[in-house]
């Protein structure tokens, strides 16, 4: 199960505007915050992690990502109705541009989510937009306009440092931070239980994962797994959930997705619009799931059934039985996902 659930979160009113230069002066690297880890604290060589120091340093770099999604229910008689549900996850502040604060999270935390809000450590919130995502790696980058962040909030924000995770050892102590159950950030501890693990979620197989016994719950998706120096070594995203199973949570190592994150950070921010203003592609298509793909030897993607005459798809040269596997350098696996991108 994904660690990001459709759980009620709590949002507060948006922050007021702030001068960009003020944000630049106030936002600092986690490893350099005054209240956190100092040069005199040799945590890396300590036999016991200073969890309080790590949490103090990292919490200002963590955000809640809350929004809404449309859920379709079904009944015994075949009739169903749609209703709006709340969704909660976690994000990690990893950088900023001249105009935006940049946040890394899981793709499933922000995919098909409306009214996306970012809640900072001081409780203030701001509208959040998606810059891009890589669904087959479950990684996304979102952005908040610096003009939507007050100077007070900016002074409490930190930027997390992404650490090379290739030298992580089994048994190494770690700290996990995330918006568990949509109730705000919480801190848990554990160790690296295993490396290079694979799991399948919603017919997509993820490989090269870290397994940890640190408690990871719904809402923790997109949160940080930190080493003793307060640096992000992995991004929490899933856990094994069944009777008799405990302590099997999974995180995506930073080293596996650093290039993807860097690429997504440079993309143009996408502001979601109403369906009547969305771009029209002009195709009817069906999803090729991983099961169908493996059986027929097709790639996972969208199989075009028809192309409307004189549509954008027609003008671009798309034809019946073509398979769409990507859009704007992003992986496409479902028609609904493509529609959401448009």
Region roles according to the model:
Residues 60-65, 91, 101, 105, ...:
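Terminal peptide-recognition signature
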Residues 1-25, 107, 129-130, 227-233, ...:
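C-terminal recognition in membrane/secretory proteostasis and scaffolding
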Residues 68-71, 96-98, 112, 133-137, ...:
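Short, conserved beta-turn/loop elements at beta-strand boundaries and strand-helix junctions
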Residues 2-79, 85-90, 114-115, 169, ...:
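N-terminal activation segment of mature serine protease catalytic domains
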Residues 95-185, 332-333:
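Conserved active-site neighborhood of the chymotrypsin/trypsin-like protease fold
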Residues 51-62, 88-90, 139, 168, ...:
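Extracytoplasmic/secreted envelope proteins and their assembly/folding machinery
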Residues 44-53, 72-102, 124-129, 159-161, ...:
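A conserved glycine-rich beta-strand in the N-terminal activation segment of trypsin-fold
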